[in-house]
From Swiss-Prot:
Bilayer topology: Single-pass membrane protein
Main location: host cell
PTM entry text: Phosphorylated on serine; O-glycosylated, but not N-glycosylated.
Signal peptide: 1-18
Protein name: Early E3B 14.6 kDa protein
Keyword vocabulary terms for this entry: Early protein, Glycoprotein, Host membrane, Membrane, Phosphoprotein, Signal, Transmembrane, Transmembrane helix
Keyword Disulfide bond: no
Compartments, record wording: Host membrane
Gene Ontology BP annotations: regulation of signal transduction
Keyword Transmembrane helix: yes
Amino acid sequence: MKFTVTFLLIICTLSAFCSPTSKPQRHISCRFTRIWNIPSCYNEKSDLSEAWLYAIISVMVFCSTILALAIYPYLDIGWKRIDAMNHPTFPAPAMLPLQQVVAGGFVPANQPRPTSPTPTEISYFNLTGGDD
């Protein structure tokens, strides 16, 4: 109820504020709603007064702000999560030990080569038992 009364009061105030004291000059060929005539009517006077344009823009900004404030609590943003403050600020240390760099740039022959990581996918042939 309070929101409705406030909204009606704003509309009444804007309509009283935006009512022109003298009739604006009307140019039928340059209407505000005919966007395709903008290049030819750029310097012409609009059929809508500037006060009405400002009022329309103000109402649109007000409505979009209210909509954004209504939607914001339902957004799942990272910093609003319950466990957002429980995450570490620095990454965990590497699980694999770093390899020692030898002066010559190669691994000596007596050290085994590092094993290749296992593939993440399963081969079709391993599932069927061969290449039938």
